[in-house]
Amino acid sequence: LSYRLMPSENWNFSVFGKYYHQFVGGPIATSSNQSEYVRTTRDVSSMGYGAAGTYFILPGLQAKLSYEKAYRLPTIEEMFGDEGLEMGDIGIKPENSDNLNLNLSYTRTFGKHSVYVEGGLIYRNTKDYIQRSIADLSGGKSAATYINYGKVLTKGFNVSARYGFGRWLSVGGNF
């Protein structure tokens, strides 16, 4: 569900909501050598939301700001394993994060030449980060499993540039 407001040609604003739902059922190993199984089910739901806005500071120069409360639901392999080298954890929680992005972009065309440059800042505050780890089993064997690691903070930036000539050449890159 989303709503977009455009009060002028220079700026717009949108808000949105997301409903995450996951129901799974399958066998879970009940012994350390993975020889005995029991059928297990799990039902998880969460609400995500966010807002985004753009504003043209000058013709061709645009600022973008967005925030999202997001979730990443565990995969089937993370919950149930692969019956070989990976053990699942049916109790693993979804990752949830607060994501913030701030971008500035500039575009200009002169004659047949066009230039586009964009730079952005990224901030992610992730809780219950799902991490793959190695667990020791009986008999000197080991297997991969998944755990909720805790809090992970990500800060970064990105830069991209593109040059175009007419309709037949476009060269760009990003970092």
Language-model region placement:
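Transmembrane beta-strands of outer-membrane beta-barrel proteins
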Residues: 13-15, 49, 63-65, 115-119, ...
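Extracellular loop and loop/strand-boundary signature of outer-membrane beta-barrel proteins
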Residues: 1-2, 30-40, 84-92, 142-148, ...
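Outer-membrane beta-barrel translocator domains and adjoining extracellular loop/strand segments
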Residues: 1, 25-34, 75-83, 129-138
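Transmembrane beta-barrel domains of bacterial outer-membrane proteins
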Residues: 1-5, 155-166, 174
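Transmembrane beta-strands of outer-membrane beta-barrel pores
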Residues: 5, 19-25, 67-73, 80-82, ...
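Hydrophobic, lipid-facing positions within transmembrane beta-strands of outer-membrane proteins
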Residues: 1, 47-51, 63, 88, ...
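Signature of Gram-negative outer-membrane beta-barrel scaffolds
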Residues: 1-58, 73
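Membrane-embedded beta-barrel scaffold of Gram-negative outer-membrane proteins
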Residues: 56, 62-68, 94-155, 164
